[in-house]
């Protein structure tokens, strides 16, 4: 499974590799070879390489030598290196090709080059860039095609935030491992096509795994022919407020029905929608695939999971009522806002799934949104650990953690930035919980399913026109593509067993 690491882990791994006997000069040579292969693949002959004063710049100087030795037209813009290994390649460049070097301060627009290779800043950047470096980045961004070494310059490699500008790359060649900043915040918008170059560094430190279809496939069991709806769980969805009036009731009835549909399409046996008594007449015309009850009926039904909080408004009694129900839970929206004001109630939700967006998480933690986005993984991990919960911190890349394990879900698209998309996610996770999939795995798989389905929908329509209901109705396409191999293998194995039993029977019959 693919994974990302922090800048601290990368530096530690780098240091251990050098101590093991592989020199920093050799590592730069390997990284520059990977960049050279990319330049050769692109077919560029007129190339600008922009080098900073650190080891990222050293990769650039080593690359420049390879490009010039191969006969390509290269202009090198750079600063004098501050590290010995980078200085090694800088000195060779100045001995052999000094006429191809220009101080970075004299760099102008790079629009005339076929390829610009960004080796300005590496993973060590912290805080705001100076005006000087911001101007360098602006000039790099004039390039026709930009390849960044390890991380686009100006992007924080841990939290993915621009500082406040960054190179906008067409391709980013991550050295040895993805960094968390490649995926968080602005990372997905500025990295372009992401690739890893293996330069022989063993990774130490924590790994943040990136959810894939194989993980999701392993969460599901085969639906046997000899089974019934009770085998696949009862998912309860407790939503809606009686304070909606007029057209608002109709709108929310439609939204709540999407929750039920997303739950059923992921495979639970039953879905029960619990809404205020006054909303029942509006629900009857909208819902065709779920049973509908009032909030008052919640105690009368045995449930395997509850998805709760969507559109309930300020309703303390309902919150406490739901928290007392003994089953798996996913808590979202207004129920999270209730917990922010009543933190003692978190003790009643051990092992449950919380799905806040950054503003809701800000209310829960007491930290500002800016503080959270500056260090989202560690803050989410600590909150989950302190409260024995599973946290899904939603974003362009969602962070799913139980305090010990942390996954990054990179599936999804900007078309999910619409009201109701979070409701679909809640329904999906609620359904997985009802099917007895452990809470952490259900949260991880649910995020991937929702995001992957959104990508499929966007391909067929657009990120502008797609609606949350489109995701709910299209979940089957995603599950079909993920699970078809699992089902095929199951039946192949079944046939093998039947064949073995038949052969064994015939042998025994012959011996008799």
Regions found by a protein language model. Give the residues of each.
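Small-residue (G/A/S/T)-rich helix-start motifs and N-terminal tracts that mark the onset
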Residues: 1-76, 81, 171, 182-328, ...
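Nucleotide and nucleotide-moiety/phosphate-recognizing core
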Residues: 36-119, 128-149
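Short, conserved loop/turn and helix-capping segments at secondary-structure boundaries
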Residues: 87, 131-134, 163-166, 374, ...
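Alpha-helix C-terminal capping/helix-to-coil transition sites in glycosyltransferase folds
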Residues: 111-112, 142, 168, 302, ...
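Rossmann-like NAD(P)-binding element
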Residues: 115-128, 308-314
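Internal gly/pro-rich beta-alpha loop/helix module
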Residues: 120-207
């Amino acid at each position: 499974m693919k994974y990302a690491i922090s800048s601290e882990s990368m530096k530690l791994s780098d240091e251990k590799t050098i101590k093991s006997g592989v020199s920093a000069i050799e590592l730069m040579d390997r990284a520059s070879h990977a960049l050279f292969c990319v330049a050769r693949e692109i077919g560029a002959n007129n190339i600008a390489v922009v080098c900073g004063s650190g080891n990222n710049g050293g990769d650039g100087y080593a690359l420049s030598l390879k490009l010039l030795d191969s006969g390509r037209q290269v202009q090198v813009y750079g600063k004098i290196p501050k590290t010995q290994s980078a200085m090694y390649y800088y000195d060779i460049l100045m001995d052999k090709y000094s006429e191809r070097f220009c101080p970075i301060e004299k760099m102008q627009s790079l629009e005339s080059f076929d390829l610009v290779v960004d080796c300005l800043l590496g993973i060590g950047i912290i805080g705001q860039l100076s005006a000087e470096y911001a101007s360098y980045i602006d000039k790099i961004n004039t390039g026709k095609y930009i390849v960044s070494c390890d991380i686009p310059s100006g992007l924080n490699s841990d939290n993915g935030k621009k500082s406040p500008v960054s190179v906008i790359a067409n391709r980013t060649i991550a050295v040895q491992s993805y960094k968390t900043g490649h995926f968080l915040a602005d990372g997905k918008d500025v990295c372009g096509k992401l690739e890893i170059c293996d330069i022989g560094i063993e990774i130490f430190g924590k790994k943040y795994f990136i959810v894939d279809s194989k993980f999701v496939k392993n969460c599901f069991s085969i639906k046997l022919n000899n089974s019934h709806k009770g085998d696949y769980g009862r998912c309860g969805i407790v939503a809606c407020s009686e304070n909606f009036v007029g057209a608002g009731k109709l709108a929310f009835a439609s939204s709540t029905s999407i929750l039920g549909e997303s739950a059923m399409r992921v495979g639970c046996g039953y879905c029960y929608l619990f809404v205020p008594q006054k909303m029942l007449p509006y629900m009857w015309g909208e819902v065709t695939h779920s049973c509908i009850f009032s909030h008052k009926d919640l105690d009368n039904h045995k449930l395997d999971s509850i998805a709760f909080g969507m559109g309930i408004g300020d309703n303390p009694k309902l919150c406490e009522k739901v928290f007392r129900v003994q089953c798996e839970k996913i808590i979202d929206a207004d129920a999270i806002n209730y917990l922010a004001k009543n933190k003692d109630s978190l003790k009643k939700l051990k092992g449950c799934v919380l799905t806040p967006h950054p503003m809701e998480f800000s209310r829960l933690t007491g930290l500002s949104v800016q503080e959270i986005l500056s260090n989202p993984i560690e803050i989410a991990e600590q909150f989950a650990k302190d409260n024995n919960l599973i946290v899904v911190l939603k974003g362009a890349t969602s962070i799913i953690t139980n305090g010990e394990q942390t996954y990054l879900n990179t599936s999804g698209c900007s078309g999910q930035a619409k009201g109701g998309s979070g409701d679909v996610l809640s329904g999906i996770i609620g359904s997985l919980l009802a099917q007895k999939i452990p809470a952490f795995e259900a949260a991880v798989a649910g995020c991937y399913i929702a995001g992957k389905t959104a990508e499929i929908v966007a391909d067929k329509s657009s990120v502008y026109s797609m609606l949350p209901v489109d995701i709910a109705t299209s979940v089957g396409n995603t599950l079909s593509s993920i699970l078809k191999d699992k089902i095929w293998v199951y039946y192949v194995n079944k046939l093998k067993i039947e064949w073995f039993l038949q052969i064994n029977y015939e042998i025994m019959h012959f011996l008799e």
